[in-house]
Structures are given as structure tokens and as C-alpha cells.
Amino acid sequence: MVDGRKPHINVGTIGHVDHGKTTLTAALTTVLAKRLSGEGNKSVKYDEIDKAPEEKARGITISTAHVEYETENRHYAHVDCPGHADYIKNMITGAAQMDAAILVVSATDGAMPQTREHILLAKQVGVKDIVVWMNKCDVVDDEEMLSLVEMEIRELLTKYGYPGDDIDVVKGSAVKALEEESADGVWSEKIMELMNALEKIDLPIREKDKPFLMSIEDVFSIPGRGTVVTGRIERGVIKVGDKIDIVGLRDIQSTVCTGVEMFHKALDAGEAGDNAGILLRGIKKEDVERGQVLSAPGQIHSYKGFKAEVYVLKKEEGGRHTPFFSNYQPQFYVRTTDVTGNIKLPDGVEMVMPGDNISIEVNLDKPVAIDKGLRFAIREGGRTIGSGIITEILE
């Protein structure tokens, strides 16, 4: 960890429209600002969150509000999206990679269509942990009703592959917590109970601890030294003398890293997040190309086929003006390269309209180094028309 900073975790509110996601976000910041000191704890009003600034991720505009808060042990970055379509885009493009999600369900309605859709998407994009905030409990005075809603949510979470029986379900009211004068009030206590549930979530393993992987952006030949490839190290660490594989587009080649450079300085090692140049032993410039990856031996393979969850841009977002059908052949921008591929739609789906999100099967023209959870853009004539995440590799 850098200079004694608190461990950091990314969370987001998910759930059906009008169930109180944004109100909860405001209540979290307000109660924590009253209860705990800390630079990160500033009360954020509902309107500030609701008028979320726009960001771009993979060429797609998404309205997201980022707030932060902290406890004694951790720092949280919290994302809330005002619009339902923004949630889907956000989850698929990974504009904010959530380590954990707070599922907001209204006690008056129970699970609704978007509740299901968000849980399913959370699972597919790799959100490991969920805690549940049952909102609007102040207007339900029937305990049995609350128990039924809780049971329904637990069953739904189990259905989509989460440990429904073990997940924390906190019953509260975001509006009441916001209105309370006292920070020790009964509804504010519920907010603290939710924070305690978040505190129990395992900290994510950051990418440095994973096997080395770097996507090649450029290839140079340096007279007297050999071939250097450059790119951003996606995960892991590379040291001089490490064995590495070159994977994708061609047969796997094995080599050894004989040098690591950053900003024209020689280093002993490069790590996740670094933009580095890697010198490769015995590899000619024409043996390697942009779009391949360097990897720790045996850690990644190249494939042509995969299943994915994709979001297709609307016309107003710069996407297509017309639907597409099965066997549509756009380019897939995977890591650092465009590869043409063929799209197969699910049985019973005739066509995909701009603005849809859909599960597809893809067959690429050339094998590329891919893994489950990898995000990609779909392009046509050099512009992004969709975005996706790989949910399954097809051998």
C-alpha cells in the first residue's frame, strides 16, 4: 500500500428505478459525515448526485456520480447512476469497476424487473460481493411482509449464483436517515449497520499479485540490443530474466525478458499499471505484432470463440441507425487490436436494435488472447457501435 493509505474499495448502488439508490447514496455520505471524522466524509446532497456529470468509457457516454466516504479502516469510492440505461452501460464498459454492490430494494415493492437485471449483470461482469439495503421500511409496519420481501431477495440472489442465505440484508429508510437530526438516531444506526456489512467484505486482490500480462501496442528494433515491445502492464510483475510467452494471432512463442524500460530508463522490474518497454531475447521484429500479449508462461491462451454480454449504442450515442441480425460481421477491439468476427444471436432473437443489451456468441477470424471478464468494443468503420464483456470462452 502506498504511504500508509487506507485500503480502497469500489462500491456502487444497483437496483430498480425509484427504489431509492440515489437517496441512499446521499444518506450514506450525510450520516458518515456526522458520525466519523475523515477527509473523505463530506455530505453530498441528492440533487448533486442526481445531476451526475457525464463520462466517456470506450466511446460511450455515461452519467455517473462518484462520491467518497471512509471508515476507520477503509476508503470507499461509490458510484451511482441516475438512469437505468446508464447502469447497464456502466457495468458492461466497466466505467467504474465495482468490487462490491449495494443492492437497493424497496420494501413496498420487493424485487422488480431491473432488480433481476442488475443482479444478473453484476454476476456476469464479476461483481464478487453484494450487500442488500431494504429501503422504505418506515412505511411497512407488517413484519411478515418485510420477511417475505427478504426471503424473495435471498432466493433471487441464490438463483443468480450469489450466496443468498449468507448475504447481509439491512432493513432501513434512506429518507428517514437523511431527515434525522441526531446522528445516533434509530435510522442513522441502520446506515451504520450497512457500513458494517460493507466492512466485512474481503478486500479485492489488486492486479499486482496476479500472473504477468501485457498487451503489445508497438514493436521496435533497437540495433545491437534486439526487439522491444511496448504497452501497459495489465497485471502482475515482470523482472529481467523472467520467461514469457507471446500469445495470440500466431502460434505461441516462448522467450525471456532481457530488459525493462520506462521513460528511457532501465529498471529491474515493471508492474501492473506501468507503461513499459520489454526487451525480448532472440525475437525478430517481424516475429511479433501489435495485438499479441506477453504473458507469464501457460497463463493465457488464444481462442476464436466466446460468449459475451453486450450493449449496443443508440443512434444518438453515435451508434448504428439500424438494427443488425445474426451473422453480422463487425470488428472487435480486443485489448490493443481490431479483429473481425461473426455474431450469432440467441435462439428466438431475430435482430438487435440500437440501445439493446443482449447475450451473443462471437466467432473471430483469428485467435486472440482472451479471458473471461475481458471487456471489448465493437466497431464498424472505425467507430464504436457497442461494448461488451466476455462471459464464457468457447474452445
From Swiss-Prot:
GTP binds at residues 15-22, 80-84, 135-138. It is an enzyme of class 3 (hydrolase). Residues 135-138 are annotated as: G4. Pfam families: GTP_EFTU, GTP_EFTU_D2, GTP_EFTU_D3. It is found in: Cytoplasm. Mg(2+) binds at T22. Gene3D superfamilies: P-loop containing nucleotide triphosphate hydrolases (3.40.50.300), Translation factors (2.40.30.10). Residues 80-83 are annotated as: G3. Residues 15-22 are annotated as: G1. GO terms for cellular component: cytosol. InterPro entries: EF-Tu_GTP-bd, EF-Tu_GTPase, EFTu-like_2, EFTU_2, G_TR_CS, P-loop_NTPase, Small_GTP-bd, T_Tr_GTP-bd_dom. GO terms for molecular function: GTP binding; GTPase activity; guanosine tetraphosphate binding; translation elongation factor activity. Residues 59-63 are annotated as: G2. Signal peptide: none annotated. It catalyses: GTP + H2O = GDP + phosphate + H(+). Keywords: Cytoplasm, Elongation factor, GTP-binding, Hydrolase, Magnesium, Metal-binding, Nucleotide-binding, Protein biosynthesis. GTP hydrolase that promotes the GTP-dependent binding of aminoacyl-tRNA to the A-site of ribosomes during protein biosynthesis. Belongs to the TRAFAC class translation factor GTPase superfamily. Classic translation factor GTPase family. EF-Tu/EF-1A subfamily. NCBIfam families: EF-Tu, PRK00049.1, PRK12735.1, PRK12736.1, small_GTP. This is Elongation factor Tu. The lineage of its organism: Bacteria, Pseudomonadati, Pseudomonadota, Alphaproteobacteria, Rickettsiales. The gene is tuf1.
